[in-house]
Amino acid sequence: MVNISPPPDSPAGLPDWLASFTNWEKQLPLDRGRREWGPLRCRKLLDRAGLSTDSCKVIQVAGSKGKGSTVLWLEALLSIRGCKTAALTSPHLISLEERIRICRNPVPFEKLLPGLQRLYPALLAGQAAGDPLPTFFDLWTALFIEIALSEKIPYLLLEVGLGGPLDSTTAIPHDVGILTTIDLEHTALLGDTCEEIAAEKSKIARDGKPLFIASGETSAVSAEIATSRGAIPEICERDPRIPEEVSAIQSTNASLALRALDHLWPESPLTSEETTLAWNQLELQGRLEVIPGPPELLLDGAHTPASIRAFVDEFSRYRDRFNRQQGFTGSNLKSGALLLGMLRDKKPEETLSELKRLNPLPQICTLGIPVPRGMDGEAIAEALVPVTAGSGITPVVAGSPEEGIDWLRKMAAIGEPIAATGSMYLAGMVRQAWLPASQA
């Protein structure tokens, strides 16, 4: 039995109190043995707190990339219909408050604390009965449900934090499952190939419930797993209701969101006009986001081979547009500057190899992200050797995030188009440094 102290009375004490609960997100190695019991711990806590989602419609979103964007699409589309939503997402860009949103707005710590205090008796009862100690994610998921129910929110949107069937969110039975694009990530936990990862993540599928699957190389594997679990799989192609200007990546996410809501509203599907309104409202922070500055910056949290591939395509367009606007031609064309930061469990060599498609290669600065899973800047530079070979580019290694961000500003000052990518953690740090506090 662990002695759990009461939640703090003020936001200042919350980080230390939360740190007393195991956080898989901050630990290495992430292997199969360390993830067992995930949903069972959370389920026990929910039951002891008397928290039931039977009165709500629950949509669970798993996948390798596009989960957060799909949740944003769901929020926007639901808001067009005047529906109240609660969204549980991870990771956050700047503040932990971002991980729980009510009607698209982060819930401030001042409102989270009463929810934790209401959960505290259930935590104590569980320890007295010999329940396993909940992890940070178990606790945060239960807090999300507590807050959503107290606000009488009818639509709950759950972004799977890691994997699928072992994630804390799987303690909550969903009405609709979504599987976004699959890519190589967390291979020690999920599998060594995209097919193995797809098979693992597809296990969120529930008997008798639909699983909407992003079309791709692994979608057939996912559909097979879903069928074996009694779910109703549907592989989703690009939906014709989506505006033509929406990128391929966001079209995939929007198509999944639309089909999920079509299932909930079979008599009144969303229209093209409503989808366009949702697109116009969408704020995709840290996802191929252009921050006006000055100086202007292309910011992206890409961290898998496919998402870096999309970043490369966008950076090429961004750089070409910059050179045209500045009137640079021939030998005066600017190659740009790129700040890179990654996590250690993201297959860096394979992911970064996509940068070879940039011709010419931009100047590069690497930095270590200051989290336990962060990859050292020197190690990132070493992983870049096959990319930079023969290019004349030698990556600069920043000694700190501040130094890396300062390098970006200096490159902008000499007229280079600038960008940052490699991790949502990096995107959050750069965004906070780039924007005034009121806008970050």
Regions flagged by a language model, labelled:
Residues G216-E234, S251, E296, L352-P417:
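C-terminal helical cap/extension that packs against the catalytic core
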Residues Y155-L158, S168-T170, H174-I178, I182-D183, ...:
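Nucleotide phosphate-binding/pyrophosphate-handling subdomain across enzymes
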Residues L74, P165-D175, R431-W434:
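Short Gly/Thr/Asp-enriched flexible loops that form oxyanion-binding sites at enzyme active sites
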Residues L30-R35, P39, K44-D54, I80-T170:
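ATP-dependent carboxylate-amine ligase catalytic core
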